Amino acid sequence: MKQYEFARHINTYFSVAQNMLFSIFLYYAFSLLIFLSIFVFKMRKALYSLLFYMCICLYIYTPVFMASLKEIEVGNYFICNLKDYPTGNCSVNHDYNKTIKLLCPIIHNKNNSDKTYDPSYCFKYDGIKDEFIINNKQNYIHNTLPGVILKSHIENDTYNLSIYPPFVVKEDITIVCICDSEKGNEGITPYLKINIKKAHGLNNDLEGDYIKGCDYGNNKGKYQFLTKSIKYTIDPICEIHAYPGDIVGINCNNYTTKIQDVSLEPNSCFGMVYFSILTMVFVKTNVNNVMPNAKYYPDLASHHGNQNSKMFLTAYLLIPNEIERDILIYCTCSYNGNKGLAIYHIFSTKED
């Protein structure tokens, strides 16, 4: 898993560095061109004044995102950098093809623990009143978006949060994820606002009301988002039949009852899965070794030291439109040594 994780980090950092260096080059190249024009050519005073004014404006009004960007769109990532902009905010329209990331400063001694990003800091957006964002933290994010995934880890004294909305959203909704205010800016709440459109599958082509999948958290009613909500003590084996273009999911946690000693295995499912071809001999492998164009949520990079793993034990797999052969994969929900086995029969052709 580490080699895939390392490759994703390298690609992201390289793209960001490339964009920054290119912007810096254009900025100074244009400035240098203006100065050279002044000394090389004999120009009228009006043109001289105009170019000089343009040069001053460049230095004053060009955003200082050359060294530190607040909003970065690179590859399949949208990154809101509130670590370097502790009084700022970002806004983004959700796109399933992009991973949304939020960087927050860690305010030590602000809370009882700074070991993880507090998931209650993400909630339904109810607007701004008197220049303050309306705090709706008591409305837990799962009440608003069952099946949402928040993954966080700490890197360079910064909370690195990845946000994955579910594939079934009953109505247009806006959520916000906030950061703690730094000392001296207590009256200002930095936040990321995410606008999410009503969705019924990736392309609004979902058959039925839920994503195909096994929910060993047994969430039902308004919390249900997968087709099979079951208890591992009653149904230790859950089987799903899936076809090219389908989305499948797994969940291990219950949203209303705290379950002790629960984990998703592999912890990077569906990035890593147990795989077999028509036999019951399974090997652990990256899913892209089996289905090269498959997409999985969350991505492997989001599992790096994730501190919210006990609360968001959910994953999704987008099966490519074409696969070469029938395959069998599985992940498990582990409960203090007992397991719920989620088996996915993925067929190369859809049944008539």
From Swiss-Prot:
Transmembrane segments: none annotated. The keyword Ligase does not apply. Disruption phenotype: Attenuated parasites that cannot commit to infection, even when they encounter with hepatocytes, resulting in continuous traversal of hepatocytes. Cells lacking both PBS36 and P52/PBS36P are severely affected in their capability to develop into liver stage parasites and abort development soon after invasion; possibly due to the absence of a parasitophorous vacuole membrane (PVM). Glycans are attached at N89, N97, N111, N156, N160, N254. GO terms for cellular component: cell surface; plasma membrane. Residues 1-29 form the signal peptide. It is found in: Cell membrane; Cell surface. Keywords: Cell membrane, Disulfide bond, Glycoprotein, Malaria, Membrane, Repeat, Signal. The keyword Acyltransferase does not apply. It comes from the Eukaryota. Residues 53-199, 210-351 form the 6-Cys domain. Disulfide bonds join C57-C90, C104-C179, C122-C177, C214-C238, C252-C333, C269-C331. Pfam families: s48_45. Involved in sporozoite infection of hepatocytes and replication therein. This is Sporozoite surface protein P36. It comes from Plasmodium berghei (strain Anka).
